[in-house]
Structures are given as structure tokens and as C-alpha cells.
């Protein structure tokens, strides 16, 4: 993309590299309180609920079963971790849910055409069912 390795995207890339090369992958979901785990489940549900209800329920159950190996990570626009959580309005904020199967990634950037307006780059992936491989079966 136009933003690659320039401006705010370079800052997000730097934060992503710092998170992925660190000794920790983030906060283990199974170590969170029940209420905090419910927030992770709600975030994942936003994506899987695009499927029919039977498929969505199956996927969500599989992802929840993997919470003992699922991590949540984020860096704020300053490039620092905050126990208060990510600032979902600030340019440069990066967030990720990474489990045995589920991968959700969100990066916030200022616009190129519309300056000063933050927009979101988001991605959802099921590592076992890429490209609808076996999901239909």
C-alpha cells in the first residue's frame, strides 16, 4: 500500500515487530477474569457471527477451547503497553488476538487522503480453515 514503510504505518510495523520478537506474546486469555474473557469472546464473535449460526457457534466454541494458548496483545500510539488497554481512537494503536486457530489483527492509521482522520485496518483469519477450505464441510 501507499503507506507501507512510511508515516504512521512504519510506526505500526515497529510496534508489531517489538511485540512479536519479545519474550512474551501478550496476555494469556486463560489468565484473565471471567468478565475479561467475555470481552475477548465478544470481540471474536464480531467476526465469526458473519457465518451462519451453526458455523459461528462451532467456531466460537473451538476458539474458546483454545484460550489456554490464546494471547491478546496491544501497543498504544506511543508504542507503549498500558494496563488500561488500547486507545481505539489513536493513530498508531495496534491490537491482536492470537490463538491456536484464531487470528484477529487491528491497526489504526491516519488517513492519506483525509488527513487527521483515523481509520482501521482489520483482519480475521482461522488458521485451520483458510480460504473456506474445510469450513463448508
Language model feature labels by segment:
Residues 1-137:
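A cross-kingdom marker for long, charged
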